[in-house]
Amino acid sequence: MEKNKKLTLTAVLVIVVAVLIDQVIKILVRTQMEQGETISVIGNWFLLHFVENEGIAFGVSFGQKIGKLLLSLFRIGVVGFLTYYVFRRIKEGKLRTGTVVLSSLVLAGAIGNIIDSLFYGVIFGYAPILYGSVVDMFYFPLFLLPDWFPVFGGEYFFPAVFNFADSCVTVGLIGLLFFLKDFADEKKGEK
């Protein structure tokens, strides 16, 4: 039982710390930079570039108001389910520390972006609750692809602008791929 309490505390700490880091960065960018402004952090390959994303990854959106509302509600539902699932599995003693940390990073990233959608429109006066935009700022235009390169020629290798929450989700999901054995072993044990 003691191990379950430690894992629960670990999950809560990872989520709280990651969400706080995400929100501090976003609020600083939102209040100190103009939309579209770029600041060089390291040369021309690590930039802060402030954009607001109304959709999901890479600016993909699902229509106007109804699409934004459905996206926000979907995000909330997924986070609710994942939170229930992770903490239930911790209580059952079914997850290792690495799996808990990585799952918590995914949850923290999702929560960080939900906070933007829920409240930023209201706080900054541009949209009602659930209709806010996600603040993105990290930009790594690593190198320019040659013009002859198929489809993406003349564009930067990594053109996405993203935020800390997106990084948490990505690192968490990639890391969880290495822990899939935990889930497979768990299923074998249940049969």
Where are these regions (language model features)?
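Alpha-helical transmembrane bundles and membrane-interface segments of multipass inner-membrane proteins
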Residues: 1-191
